[in-house]
Amino acid sequence: MSLHIPFEARYAALPDRFHAQLAPTPVSAPGLIKVNHRLARELGLDPAALESPEGVAMLAGNAVPEGAVPIAQAYAGHQFGGWNPQLGDGRAILLGELRHADGALRDVQLKGSGPTPFSRMGDGRAGLGPVLREYILSEAMHALGVPTTRALAAVTTGERVLREQVLPGAVFTRVASSHLRVGTFQFFAARDDLDALETLCDFARARHDPEAETALDLLRGVIARQADLIARWMGLGFIHGVMNTDNMTISGETIDYGPCAFMEAYHPDTVYSSIDRHGRYAYRNQPEIAVWNLAQLATALLPLIDADQDRAIEVATEAVHGFADLYQSAWLDVFRAKLGLATAREEDAKLAHGLLRLMAEAGVDFTLAFRGLAEGQEVARKLYAQPEIFDAWARDWRARLAEEGVDAETLTARLTSANPAFIPRNHRVEQAIQAGMAGDFAPFHTLVAVLERPFDDQPEHAAYMAPARPEEAVRETFCGT
């Protein structure tokens, strides 16, 4: 057993204005919560070594592995539409990059690892609750087939952090295709630093779009990835809650799970985040906000797209406007799969929207409504206060399926593979967090294990499928930073 970690330092090799180099701040008594064994092995790491005292010390920030060049990254961003020219990693430190089994590089970052030059008077630490939440949510999203940052490990620090109350401290090890954000490009564009912008564009293309030859190609790649990502969110009833430009990745991965939530009773205007008082990031608004964010990326890239500003604006605008068709196509692919359809017809959008309208009118649980389609009409119709309304929709659905000549067994397989039985329901996440705060991590471990197999029948965990009872319901979520 050894803790040899072959870190590369690609981003740390960029000029100093891209980052601040500093070591994590040690903690007093690091303790292991969980190491993600499968992900560790995919990164060429020995899980047992990570769980050793030496490994836990590294995961807590008490020891910097040989080859790592720890840095905090600089970026800016629009937060709820308001411009902030100086954000950056205020409580996170990038250790370096590792080569994944798929051949691509992955960032390895410690969150809650102490103050940095970007902390803006913060302590640079993370509470246990947000660390457990990000572990649960990011790994659940991965199992659900959504591009996302990953959870490699979570450790306690033996220290306390002061927020609205005193909380146990923790450090989260996040793995990502990169931590490049729309806000990273905005940071340099706002400073008219064309050299840095070109360097960043070259880095991003090499990392995420190796076939892209220009900044416009990079922009188009980001637009396509984000269209696919948002469609996947919508297909799960997922609400990110804080779609600021510093929380939109160039890679197309979901990042930063602070106030996110999964809808239970379906309504397109649903908001959970306590800080989203005007519903800017409501479920229905997510595609529109994605376009707004991508327009900010396009604006940042204008000097690299064409020396003629009018021409640059013209082609960048055309690229951003292309999001609508890409998103609509991806959304239809997602919802066709959720309806068990393997072919495309013009009327499919009407069929999907028709069911969503019924779900909204009846306040039906989003996840159970779609999973119920696999369990037969008698099960599905009972979710509605007026089952006959569902029956009318189901006749059109069955007629559409008949066009494909699909047999019952194949249909069931299609539906169960596209519609999860288990999602990280807000009350279950909260229960796991509260138990962990009291020193009991068993509910956390159980929930993580259940969510590793979201599409499988798990009769022994059937209770995890159920929506919250009124007294359990989580109606508001918090950033928790």
UniProtKB/Swiss-Prot annotation:
Its cofactor is Mg(2+); Mn(2+). It holds the Pfam family SelO. Keywords: ATP-binding, Magnesium, Manganese, Metal-binding, Nucleotide-binding, Nucleotidyltransferase, Transferase. It catalyses: L-seryl-[protein] + ATP = 3-O-(5'-adenylyl)-L-seryl-[protein] + diphosphate; L-threonyl-[protein] + ATP = 3-O-(5'-adenylyl)-L-threonyl-[protein] + diphosphate; L-tyrosyl-[protein] + ATP = O-(5'-adenylyl)-L-tyrosyl-[protein] + diphosphate; L-histidyl-[protein] + UTP = N(tele)-(5'-uridylyl)-L-histidyl-[protein] + diphosphate. ATP binds at residues 88, 90-91, 111, 123-124, 174, 181, 256. InterPro entries: SelO. Its EC number is 2.7.7.-, 2.7.7.108. The active site is at residue 246. Mg(2+) binds at residues 247, 256. One of its GO terms (molecular function) is AMPylase activity. HAMAP family: YdiU_SelO (MF_00692). Nucleotidyltransferase involved in the post-translational modification of proteins. It can catalyze the addition of adenosine monophosphate (AMP) or uridine monophosphate (UMP) to a protein, resulting in modifications known as AMPylation and UMPylation. PANTHER family: PROTEIN ADENYLYLTRANSFERASE SELO, MITOCHONDRIAL (PTHR32057:SF14). Belongs to the SELO family. This is Protein nucleotidyltransferase YdiU. It comes from Dinoroseobacter shibae (strain DSM 16493 / NCIMB 14021 / DFL 12). The lineage of its organism: Bacteria, Pseudomonadati, Pseudomonadota, Alphaproteobacteria, Rhodobacterales.
